[in-house]
Amino acid sequence: MSIEVKNLIKAFGKNTVIDDISFKVDNGEILAIVGFSGSGKSTVLKLISGLIEKDGGEIITTGDIAMVFQYSALIDSLNVFDNIPFALRERIDLRKKYAKEQVKNIVKEKLAMVGLSGIEKKFPSELSGGMQKRVSFARAIVTEPEIILYDEPTAGLDPMSSTLIENYIVRLKQETNAASIVVTHQMSTIMRTADKVLMLYGGKPVFFGTPDELCKQETPYTKQFVSADLEGPMKMIKE
């Protein structure tokens, strides 16, 4: 077990945004957390990563946690080579562990794992959105984490780039054996990457199961999410 969440609760003022959520993710598994906008998906990742504090429940993790942010969060003033080992320089325990030549080899290894060998000297502005995302993957795995959190990893990407990113999420799971959580609203990402799916609605769990089971659900929330139908419990503002 790498992640276990028990009865998780988070509120902002009087607004409870995460309401009694529980799940487990083992090593080598990918859990997709899905739902409509505002359902609390990204808040769960922020709670697990420690970016915000919970108001109730337990979060039990084993090993280092890495976060891949929605918009890559690369440092524009640094080239790829300097972006990737950022955690190795900032964490005192890791700074003392690796010599300069070792860091260089680690960067090359991680870039190769995401299919980007040879771009060390390029700056983020010189890369496509998909390439920036893959660099952020390389940065995430530089500390050999046991847990990888992906926040909307295909946001803003074209369909082919999205497929490539989805394939690398699965590949990194296989190569690192990390427990992974992918927050997404894309059915393609769910079907290509996830072993299990947790669906939230209004901060509450309304489904937990496999991607195939999600597609067969007839409950109003899950059915509308899968079909992208405008008719259902989730109402869109019409122009």
Where are these regions (language model features)?
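Conserved ABC ATPase "signature" region
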Residues: 98-118
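Helix-to-loop junction immediately C-terminal to a conserved catalytic motif
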Residues: 49
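Conserved catalytic motifs of ABC-family nucleotide-binding domains
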Residues: 144
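Conserved ABC ATPase signature
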Residues: 123-127, 131
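A short, surface-exposed alpha-helical micro-motif characterized by mixed small hydrophobic
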Residues: 190-192
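The feature captures the beta-strand-to-loop junction immediately N-terminal to the Walker
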Residues: 34-36
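Catalytic Walker B motif of ABC-type/P-loop ATPase nucleotide-binding domains
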Residues: 148-151
